[in-house]
């Protein structure tokens, strides 16, 4: 088996996972990076279309995994036509078990390919109240997968403690700011270019405006 270090990115075609993809490419080289995309029954096909387009455009191998069986056992606004709202501490866009499932399937795939490093774009700084975006969950899952498969995975979460403003700054540092701004899809409602009103769009645009304001201010002070 090839001993060259490789990485796989859990990839949705959104801002966060695309930022992780650019970081993985910078660290490992584009020829040593793959992406895994999940069809979990999401309401809008645009998410899958964007992911496929970006993977092809950047020249990385994409593997699509169907986990839509989850739709048969849980209900939420990401997969069904429900109004997006907060339910207690967790919004109804939360898909129970999604990130656990994504990490498990990605790890199974990665081991078969001889890959140890897994990138995921989860974040608990500006996170939407999703329990499976927390660092404690990812670290726990890393230990569980290592024990379950007798294999040393390294789950990387480069965005874990970054605000959205800082995530835009990282994209800029990676030379991917314009690409991510133009080509990624984040909108919960599936609107091309964003609806500007759903929680995901609001968070993305708030971080973008904060970063651009800070960048412009910094340039004026030089």
Curated annotation (Swiss-Prot):
Chain residues that bind ATP: 11-21
Listed pathway(s): Purine metabolism; 7-cyano-7-deazaguanine biosynthesis
CDD domains noted in UniProt: QueC-like
Enzyme Commission identifier(s): 6.3.4.20
Catalysis: reaction(s): 7-carboxy-7-deazaguanine + NH4(+) + ATP = 7-cyano-7-deazaguanine + ADP + phosphate + H2O + H(+)
Coiled-coil portions: none
First and last residue of the signal peptide: none
An MF annotation (GO) of this entry: ATP binding
Intrachain S-S bonds: none
Keywords, alphabetical: ATP-binding, Ligase, Metal-binding, Nucleotide-binding, Queuosine biosynthesis, Zinc
Cofactors required: Zn(2+)
Species in which this protein is naturally found: Actinobacillus pleuropneumoniae serotype 5b (strain L20)
Official protein name in the record: 7-cyano-7-deazaguanine synthase
Similarity comment: family membership: Belongs to the QueC family.
GO biological process, alphabetically ordered: queuosine biosynthetic process
Residues annotated to bind Zn(2+): 187, 195, 198, 201
Pfam families, A to Z: QueC
Cofactor binding, per record: Binds 1 zinc ion per subunit.
InterPro entries, alphabetized: QueC, Rossmann-like_a/b/a_fold
Gene3D superfamilies reported in the protein's UniProt record: HUPs
Job description of the protein: Catalyzes the ATP-dependent conversion of 7-carboxy-7-deazaguanine (CDG) to 7-cyano-7-deazaguanine (preQ(0)).
NCBIfam families xrefs: 7-cyano-7-deazaguanine synthase QueC (TIGR00364)
């Amino acid at each position: 088996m090839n001993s060259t270090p490789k990485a796989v990115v859990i990839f949705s075609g959104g801002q966060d996972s695309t930022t992780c993809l650019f970081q993985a490419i910078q660290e490992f080289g584009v020829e040593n990076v793959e992406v895994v995309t999940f069809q979990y029954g999401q309401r809008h096909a645009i998410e899958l279309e964007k992911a496929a387009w970006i993977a092809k455009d950047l020249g990385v191998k994409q593997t699509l995994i169907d986990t839509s069986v989850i739709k048969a056992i849980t209900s939420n606004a990401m997969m069904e036509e429900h109004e997006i709202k907060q339910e207690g501490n967790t919004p109804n866009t939360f898909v129970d078990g999604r990130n656990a499932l994504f990490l498990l399937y990605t790890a199974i795939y990665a081991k078969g390919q001889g890959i140890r490093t897994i990138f995921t774009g989860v974040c608990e700084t500006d996170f939407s109240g999703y329990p499976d975006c927390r660092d404690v969950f990812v670290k726990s899952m890393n230990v569980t997968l290592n024990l379950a498969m007798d294999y040393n995975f390294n789950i990387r979460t480069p965005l874990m403690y970054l605000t959205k403003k800082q995530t835009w700054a990282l994209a800029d540092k990676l030379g991917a700011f314009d690409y991510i701004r133009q080509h990624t899809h984040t909108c919960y409602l599936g609107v091309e270019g964003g609806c500007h009103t759903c929680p995901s769009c609001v968070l993305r645009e708030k971080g973008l405006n904060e970063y651009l304001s800070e960048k412009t201010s910094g340039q004026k002070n030089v």
